[in-house]
Amino acid sequence: MKKLLAAAAALATVSTMAMAERYVMITHTQGTDPFWPVVEKGGRDAAAAIGAEFEYNFDPSGDMSGMAKLIEAAAASNPDGIIVSLPDADALGGAIRAAADAGIPVVTMNSGLESSAAVGALMHVGQPERLAGEKAGARAKAEGVTNGLCLNQEAFNTALVDRCEGYFSGLGGDLNMIDVSNDVTQIETRTAAALSADPSIDGVLAVGPHVCAAANKAIKDVGADVHLSCFDLSPEVMDMIQAGDAAFTIDQQQRLQGYMPVIVLHLYNTNAGMLPGANIPSCLLYTSPSPRDLSTSRMPSSA
């Protein structure tokens, strides 16, 4: 009897393992941005909470064709769902649509809110990027900025372009955006060159945390008196805000962007296609210094 019970338990364990859900997340990081490990951890934590397997992939080259191939490879492995950032719908849309047409549920996250439904995704989890940029620009204007510069480390990424365009919509004035790349040395060099070429620039928006840190160094090297604001959180950005080197950052809640798609897909797969009634906007939050610590305040939900 004991042997029979042991065999039954072993069979149940094998069956449970075979039935475990498996989700694949693919993002456009090149592995240098401190933003994305937080997203990945959110996905892994969600998968652990529901007992699912989780895979995380990215193309270190940052090439969109390479990312599309990763999506195709994930679809070929027949997972229970794919989670993907969508910085370039033209380059990635075909692979995402093919996965959806093959019956694999897809949720987009982070970038690609406007294109998510068109490429066949069930829904999107992420920040409304243009609105976030507008709020950053409006706050910079209220804090005295008159002539801005937006630093974009991924020229192909429509979400970052939306942030920059929104910034100048809120600030007023024509778009002044430069491609600084993801290389820290290039970010510093190009930012310093732009500030030296136009000393009237009194406001800089960095649309990524590592860009913000590099921009801060460039500003100090040039000796410019510039209002610096950022997107996203990192320990270095938090220290910069506390020290007064950055005015504020906009926290788009990247852990939520990694966590919620896994939960959404789990509910979809285990509850007869249940989905939230709308896309899930990750919170628009300002993080700025208070006398004792870093305070966080929610932005208004509309422009």
Predicted segments, located by residue:
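Flexible loop/hinge segments that line or gate small-molecule binding clefts
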Residues: 89-131, 232-247
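Hydrophobic alpha-helical
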Residues: 71-72, 80-101, 167, 176, ...
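Conserved small/polar residues in nucleotide/adenosyl-binding loops
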Residues: 286-293
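Gram-negative bacterial Sec-dependent N-terminal signal peptides
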Residues: 1-19
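Short beta-strand elements in bilobed, periplasmic/extracellular small-molecule ligand-binding domains
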Residues: 50-60, 150, 170-184
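Short, solvent-exposed amphipathic alpha-helices that sit
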Residues: 34-49, 132-136, 158-174, 190, ...
